Amino acid sequence: MRVPYKWLQQYVDVTLPPAELADKLTMAGLAVEGVEDLTPGFQKVVAGKIKTITPHPDADHLVICNVDAGRELQLVTGAPNVHEGQMVAVALEGARLPGGREIHRATFRGVVSEGMLCSAQELGLDVSLVSPEDREGIITLPPDASPGADAAEVLGLKDVVLVLELTPNRADCLSILGVAREVAAITGAPIHLPATLPGEDGPEITGLATVEITAPDLCARYVARLVQGVRIGPSPAWLQAFLRAAGMRPINNVVDITNFIMLEMGQPLHAFDYDLLEGHRIIVRRAGPGEKITTLDGVERELDPEMLVIADAARPVAVAGVMGGLATEVTPATTNILIESAHFDGASIRRTSRRLGLRSEASTRFERGVNLEGAPAAADRAARLMAELAGGRVAPGRIDCYVKRRQPVTIELRPERVNYLLGTELAPTTMKELLERLHLEVRGEGPFQVTVPAYRGDLTGEIDLVEEIARLYGYNRIPVTLPGNLTAREKQAPAQRWEEAGREAAAAAGLAEVITYSFIGPRALDQLRLPEDHPWRRTVKIQNPLREEQSIMRPSLLPGLLEVAGRNASRRVLPVAIYELGRVFIPAGSRRPGEPLRLAGLVMGTTPRGWNWPAGEMDFYYLKGILESIFSRLRVRDVSWEASNAYPFLHPGRAATIKAGTRVLGYLGELHPDVLAAVELPARACAFELDWEAAGDLALRVPRYEPLPRFPAVERDLAVVVPATTPAAAVAGVIREAGGELLRAIALFDVYEGAPVPEGCKSLAYSLVYQLPDRTLTDAEVNAAQERIQRALEERLGASLRQ
């Protein structure tokens, strides 16, 4: 938002230097990105009026202009756009132009030129802010400029502009008046609101035009004013100067007035040629299927029923809140103007603007939020200025279709809560005075009842008022204190604590957190080699996707991890060891989609080598170890790993289902080579994904204390021969079950294949620890347990003791 300093001073008595005011605004939460001095790089350039033009006697491409520049001057020019009565910029003898060029009296084919007529480029001006006609020739100054006046003053260049970087919630400051309110609140200076009510003459507008709203969900209010008998022409110098300083190009007096009021009050306006409106009707409706409109930029655009249009009795005449139509454009022949001042739904305007590829100052304001109560005043002010600057007559009354009224917003504010949150000791009277500076109505002595004006749509709760008090009081004046609430973690819900514990455990295991988009494209599922009937193919589709690659909600965290891994690998950032804890989306018919919480991770590359350990590949067992450390840290019990070929995106033979009893928690495995090729990963990679809420159900949230053993343990080794396809975990399960309460611990310490073990078999050796907490075990009890284990292994797994 560009705020010309002189324009700002029209509404608030501010005398601070611009740089100092910029600092105060920034400290109050309105960040000033820059202070731009418009002082021009030229001297001795004045306004002049061309009195006569005569051909050059000896050059067909030159003319001789007799110019009143405070004194009579003869100037020779080759500009194609000069005409008698035109106000121009005249560089006098001795003038200096940008780049150091100095102007002297010169003779052109025997005719003396006592100066030079200047173009926008020669004056160092932004050519986008001058008319297309003036870009190829000399610049035309406003017709009310005085001959001999400083051209820099006429062009509004002796000014300073504050460039504000506004946060999305401060839509009220997308106007000079909004910034003026802030300046008044910060400095205590009085604010002066502009006059709005026009003089009226002639028949009532209600007998000359009608307005109908058929889409009240997209248009809450529509105000119309009628101005008759206008004369289209250039705007006065002051208006053109303000518009240029604010970054807008002057066009004509009527259009300039609508732009001026949009910048002044924050309310976008549109001016229709009243005589070109069929039936003199305004209908605010959705577009019809395939309906088309040619907008002011000359482009024919196809509309759809999701878009809001302004129509007359026959056709759409504007895309609501985005751009007007060419059919009812204000032209030099226009004499009667219908002014539109409306409130359109911001989300609808945003969608329409994006689909049509059209963004404008108006659409930006509607997207951020426009003051619902400000439409009548803006229409009145526009009518008043058109009467003053375009010679029009304002029809009495206005049409105001207000179909969706704003409900007053009143917020309760507790002074003690303010001081608690800020760490201050402000008196309630001080808080009240600070809020009243912002034109908030404050009732009561505490708690206060604070009524919010319509233009402050960002104030919705008590915490917003606390912020307003803090920024006006001064962040730099708030004392440094410890937070008043040091037990926030204890007040977290169990689900929140479990989620945070997952992040801490994954980070402690050496994984870096990533956060990826919740929406992906169908191609991401194709890359995972998923068959058409795979559950992940049933996705939640986005109705209005930004693009095809973001058209469905993710059924898994794996696509996002693959994208991050690919981006890192393409930049040679290896190894990759990442995780994400987030929600996936599962369709549930007509009900709201399910959003289960998942923990997923991916590793790729080799571990860094150290002085006492070699580099190693991040393979299946490396990632399994990470998961085991996470489970151990969070006391997730009874986890088992079962070889599986059920996952088409994992390498057959290097994949496992993670289970707890019969409950499936997730998967772990090396990615299939075809998947690696599809996502262009240069090395083997392994991934896992867990149902994190299910894992939480198994976790021992409160550690269980067990007394240290007082009686000695008995250790025995057991080596058995089993078929080579028998999982070691299955053997351990049988041993644990048969050992009963005597068996305290079991650990696999040797795996062997080869002679003398029979072919097709393997030897597994386990260390068994027997112990009871209340007495010493006898050899007979331990021997009996060993025999039970051997019989169970033989009966259930066909195992035999290794000789």
UniProtKB/Swiss-Prot annotation:
Q: What class of enzyme is it?
A: ligase
Q: Where does Mg(2+) bind?
A: D458, D464, E467, E468
The protein's name in its UniProt record = Phenylalanine--tRNA ligase beta subunit
Q: Which UniProt keywords apply?
A: Aminoacyl-tRNA synthetase, ATP-binding, Cytoplasm, Ligase, Magnesium, Metal-binding, Nucleotide-binding, Protein biosynthesis, RNA-binding, tRNA-binding
PROSITE patterns to which the protein is assigned, alphabetical: B5, FDX_ACB, TRBD
Subunit (UniProt):
Tetramer of two alpha and two beta subunits.
**The encoding gene:** pheT
HAMAP family xrefs: Phe_tRNA_synth_beta1 (MF_00283)
